[in-house]
Amino acid sequence: MLVNNGGGLPQGDTDNPELIAQPRGGTPAVIDTREGLEKASRALAQGSTPIALDVERAQGFRYGSDPYLVQIRREDVGSFLIDTHALPDLSVLQPGVEDVWLLHDCLQDLPNLRQVGLRPSALFDTEIAARLVGLERFGLAAVAEQVLGLGLVKDHQASDWSVRPLPKEWLRYAALDVELLTELYYRLSKRLDQMGRWEWAQQEFAHALSVEPPTAKPDRWRSLPGAGKIRSRRGLGVLKALWETRESIARRIDMSPGRLVRNAALVRAASNPPPNKRALMSINEFRSPIARQYEDEWMRALASVAALTEDELPPKRKPVQPGSIPEPRQWVRIDEASAARLGIVRSAVASVAASVGLAPEVVLAPQVQRYLAWAPLDPSRPSGDEVEERMVTRGARDWQIDLTLDPVCDALGV
């Protein structure tokens, strides 16, 4: 299907998307000075169109998920590429971005944008919108193909954006990431309105703005691939100590922990705890040029575990957090009645989802479905009250409750 795009974009074809190779107006120069930032602020403040934003990080290379480049575009002003390593405080831009923000998968980027001093006043997320109109592929490039008939090359998504200077080809890619967001906003907004789902989208955007960044889970070392095969408490103690040491070193040298020592090496060491330095160095990853610099710290970690009594070692099973719900695959073993209820809830939600042409997880999040099913309902309470209360407690939006409350209650017989 041919698509007559606006904003100076070429005509698209959803059956044969045209690849967008260059940003309109060319690739902007990187802003890395205070003077350049203030100039950008004045320019953005003159615009009246929505604000398209994106963030590039260096995950897998640096420790954590700090932003290294922020891209901003207003159709009536142009695009800006801002080096947030050189300019970690972008709050001077705030007066010029007091309009609706356009993001794709906003939960990835909002924490970084807040980190650099920017706060949204309103939001439109093109990924959320794509899900609500029934698209089955949600990546930015896929949405652009399906809605605009235009293609984007996603070849630097996992690059090390902390390198300086940034290659010109990477900057072109970064500018293209905000090139199509405004046209997507116009077209997806129209579809949402035509389908009677604009209010659904507004509720989703408001919810996204209210989401707090996730806190680090306790005992993250237990989630390493292969950790479940370690049977001894001593081995688990070694895994915990090496993981914590790796975190400490990686944070100190600003390196992704997996680049310092791979997860598999930690698990291997914990499966057969090395009694001495020679045994530890027999594991290839620990004698790499980087990891070997910290051999004394690795050995201190091992020695600290060797000095622990059995009672001081980690338990074989991860401690259950109060109020936590087990993984669904464990339900049949733990509580067959809860497993049966989950099947009923899932079936009811899937039926509703099919009737409106959406994925079940869009109609009601899996964690909400699990919360509905895990504990028995109180038979003394009025029909449906407890189900609705549980939905609200777990963050279901009004439109989701309106769609699913009665079908779920009917399925559960309440």
Identify the function of each model-found stretch:
Residues 59-62:
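A structured, charge-rich N-terminal accessory region that forms the first stable segment of a protein
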